[in-house]
UniProtKB/Swiss-Prot annotation:
Family annotation (InterPro entries): Globin, Globin-like_sf, Globin/Proto, Hemoglobin_a-typ, Hemoglobin_oxygen_transport, Hemoglobin_pi
Tissue spec. comment: Red blood cells.
Gene: HBAD
Gene3D superfamilies, per the entry: Globins (1.10.490.10)
Family membership noted in the UniProt record: Belongs to the globin family.
Species for this entry: Passer montanus
GO biological process, alphabetically ordered: hydrogen peroxide catabolic process
Positions bound to heme b: H58, H87
Protein name: Hemoglobin subunit alpha-D
Subunit structure: Heterotetramer of two alpha-D chains and two beta chains.
Function, in words: Involved in oxygen transport from the lung to the various peripheral tissues.
UniProt entry keywords in alphabetical sequence: Heme, Iron, Metal-binding, Oxygen transport, Transport
């Protein structure tokens, strides 16, 4: 459960990305594909090289979905409902992959933000990403 302080930290840190959202999303995906090679199976048509247009484009979509979730922290289920349906019913993505992406996104954020990615921010982002993963996996039950 996200506390009021967690929500505040998440919104603040997201606001500091300053137009680097696509870059962070692409970096997180690239890290995921290389740290967890099994995730590549969902993207057989993608050029999975670092910085490819396809990774950048999908990274932008991932970050846009997370931005929408951050705007709707009190109603994540509704904010992510369509995305949950897509991943569960159409794409049939194994829910463990949401955790993999979460870990890689946190590394990308920490790398980008340096000291601003404090232990408190890390904890808040980890809770947020766990909540997102949980909501995305709801339709699998």
């Amino acid at each position: 459960m996200l506390t009021a302080e967690d929500k505040k930290l998440i919104q603040q840190i997201w606001g500091k990305l300053g137009g680097a959202e696509e870059e962070i999303g692409a970096d997180a995906l690239w890290r995921m594909f290389h740290s967890y090679p099994s995730t590549k199976t969902y993207f057989p048509h993608f050029d999975l090289s670092q910085g490819s247009d396809q990774i950048r484009g999908h990274g932008k979509k991932v970050v846009a979905a997370l931005s929408n979730a951050i705007k709707n922290l009190d109603n994540l289920s509704q904010a992510l409902s369509e995305l949950s349906n897509l991943h569960a019913y159409n794409l049939r993505v194994d829910p463990v992959n949401f955790k993999f992406l979460s870990q890689c996104l946190q590394v990308s954020l920490a790398t980008r933000l340096g000291k601003e990615y404090s232990p408190e921010v890390h904890s808040a982002v980890d809770k947020f990403m766990s909540a997102v993963a949980s909501v995305l996996a709801e339709k699998y039950r």
